[in-house]
């Protein structure tokens, strides 16, 4: 009887935590613009500056379009230079040894939507881990698990905005949320990694959504 009761308690706690994780994710989507508006988003142009290391600072533009097209451009010595992208077939990234854009056959493009848009249909399991503090802000900590991959998300417990995302080899901090159309988007993104070799701070001053890009914008 005790064993049966323990199994029931464990099963119920797993169910309730999954429900809680779902509620947190649903609340984030709702308060950041709503699922319909996120699904109506077809393209994004991010503009601002990126700070690399202590002093290196460059103007940056990031073009993104469904389903997974992307292009990142830095302005270096008054010249626009593509440093990374995906044209729908091939991936490209800057080879800093040769200072040339190089094709990468093993390039894995990221989905246009983040993982917690339609996470259930994508095969993820959501787990509510508990509350943790980021700075002075209490956050809901949620894990999204698929096969051996696990990402961790921290949502502000008051606003439900995403403040931190921990991937396998990168941590992203999001802040300075502003309305862009009907959507709430972060205008400050900070990336850090265990190796500290690709850390950056991106400060955006303009985000445009659903622009029609020129046909050649994703050609490299």
Regions found by a protein language model. Name each.
Residues 1-21:
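Bacterial Sec-dependent N-terminal signal peptides
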Residues 19-24, 30, 37, 85-152, ...:
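Flexible, processing/modification-adjacent segments and terminal tails
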Residues 22-97:
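N-terminal mature ectodomain segment of secretory-pathway/periplasmic proteins
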Residues 45-49, 73, 92, 131, ...:
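Residue-level detector of beta-strand face positions
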Residues 46-50, 54-56, 76, 107-111, ...:
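Mature soluble domains of exported/periplasmic/lumenal proteins and thiol-rich metal-chelating peptides
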Residues 57-61, 81-83, 101, 152, ...:
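Well-ordered beta-strand positions in beta-sheet-rich domains
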Residues 64, 130-133, 176-179:
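Short, low-complexity Ser/Thr-rich regulatory SLiMs
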Residues 138-219:
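Gly/Pro-enriched, hydrophobic low-complexity segments
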């Amino acid at each position: 009887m005790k064993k049966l009761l323990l199994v029931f308690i464990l099963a119920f706690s797993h169910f309730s935590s999954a429900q809680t994780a779902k509620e947190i994710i649903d609340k984030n989507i709702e308060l950041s613009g709503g699922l319909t508006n996120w699904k109506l988003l077809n393209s994004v142009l991010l503009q601002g500056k990126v700070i690399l290391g202590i002093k290196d600072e460059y103007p940056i533009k990031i073009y993104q379009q469904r389903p997974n097209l992307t292009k990142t451009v830095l302005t270096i010595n008054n010249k626009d230079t593509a440093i990374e992208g995906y044209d729908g077939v091939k991936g490209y990234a800057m080879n800093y040894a040769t200072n040339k854009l190089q094709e990468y056959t093993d390039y894995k493009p990221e989905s246009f939507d983040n993982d917690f848009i339609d996470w259930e249909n994508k095969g993820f399991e959501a787990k509510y881990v508990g509350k943790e503090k980021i700075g002075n802000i209490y956050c809901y900590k949620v894990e999204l698990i698929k096969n051996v991959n696990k990402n961790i998300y921290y949502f502000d417990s008051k606003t439900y905005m995403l403040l931190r995302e921990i991937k396998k080899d990168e941590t992203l901090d999001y802040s300075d949320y502003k309305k862009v159309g009907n959507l709430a988007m972060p205008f400050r993104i900070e990336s850090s990694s265990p190796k500290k070799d690709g850390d950056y701070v991106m400060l955006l001053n303009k985000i445009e959504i659903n622009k029609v890009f020129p046909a050649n914008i994703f050609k490299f």
